[in-house]
């Protein structure tokens, strides 16, 4: 089952979503990523259900003067529980996004994750990470140019931790907009 609620005003927003997905759930189309868990030590996939709680609260500041059109501050929590109600994953995020009156934007985001790996996991051909609790955080900043123009661009940089290591990421993109018929975007991302 899944149930949710949403409340929005000009300045304030709130979202809550609750879900319970059993290991025997199969979608009619696509797939549910979290059900299939890969055990790198046994080289097999194990189906595990989950319970999910997502909340987001946001607040908008709408200046009447100056170059800023809107400042949005938001906080998100996504908590995943195992079928026995033990914690599987908890992701918290704080975001500040500034939309300028010229349709460009600037954003800052801070993410904190707590992940309890149920099974040894490998992201590379190296030694699998052991099944245990990991806590890691990332910080990112991004800018997007005026979206109304024929050509636009965006870039984002983030850095922090990832499981037992560090991560640095840079992404950039260009956009060609010929409304109402065409909107073409080319993105590139580098992760280290």
Predicted feature residues:
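Exposed, low-structure sequence patches enriched in small/polar residues
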Residues: 1-192
């Amino acid at each position: 089952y899944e149930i949710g609620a949403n409340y929005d005003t000009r300045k304030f927003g709130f979202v809550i979503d609750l879900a319970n997905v059993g290991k025997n759930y199969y979608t009619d189309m696509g797939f549910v990523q979290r059900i299939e868990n890969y055990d790198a030590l046994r080289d097999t996939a194990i189906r595990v259900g989950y319970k999910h709680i997502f909340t987001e609260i946001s607040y908008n500041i709408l200046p009447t003067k100056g170059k800023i059109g809107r400042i949005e501050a938001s906080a998100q929590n996504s908590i995943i529980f195992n079928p026995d109600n033990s914690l599987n994953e908890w992701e918290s995020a704080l975001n500040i996004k500034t939309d300028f009156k010229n349709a460009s934007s600037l954003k800052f985001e801070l993410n904190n994750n707590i992940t309890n790996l149920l099974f040894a996991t490998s992201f590379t051909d190296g030694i699998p990470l052991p099944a245990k609790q990991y806590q890691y955080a990332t910080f990112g900043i991004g800018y997007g140019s005026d979206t109304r123009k024929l050509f636009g661009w965006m870039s984002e940089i983030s850095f922090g931790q990832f499981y037992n290591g560090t991560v640095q990421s840079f992404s950039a993109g260009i956009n060609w907009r010929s409304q109402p018929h065409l909107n073409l975007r080319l993105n590139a991302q580098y992760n280290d």
